[in-house]
Amino acid sequence: SSAWAGVHVNFSKPDNYSDMPFSSRDREQILAGLAEHFQLLGKGLRPGQDLKIEVTDVDLAGREDPMRRGAMEVRVMDGRTDWPRMRLRFQLEQNGKVIASGNAALSDMSYLQRINRYSSNDALRYEKKMIDEWFEDTFGIKPQGRSKPVLTLQQPVHRR
């Protein structure tokens, strides 16, 4: 019904994204976690508002270390050139009429230096913070609560 507010997330050609985990299970977890996070933020939309998001690229924080692939995958975070990035298109409708739309390029260059409210075991903690800031800047909506942590097989390793 048109009174229902919600977020619809579509991942366009995820196999072509700049940086995703190597394992297909982890890739699925990441996409599901991103979708769930956008849906949580969408709870702040006004009644009758629908937000359609098409994610066209994801570059996760850190870099996969291909030398350490095996039982334990490693994602190295050095904070130099490996900050999280995402590209998306969005369309906000009010009762079926488009009231805002655009393309957005999200990034957080100082992701390692900043306070982060998400759990340190959440594989998407840096991406969620970046999305929160974009959502607040674009729609004036702050997150209510936290989406559940996304757990992947990758171990984050911080290198200075």
Model features per residue range: what roles?
Residues 16-17, 24, 101-133:
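Short secondary-structure boundary motifs at beta->alpha junctions and helix caps
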Residues 1-5:
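Gram-negative bacterial Sec-dependent N-terminal signal peptides
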Residues 55-93:
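Surface-exposed short loop/turn segments
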Residues 36-38, 116-160:
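C-terminal/domain-edge helix-coil "capping" segments
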Residues 6, 11-57:
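N-terminal segment of the mature soluble domain
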Residues 43-51, 91-101:
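A short, structured loop/turn motif at beta-sheet edges
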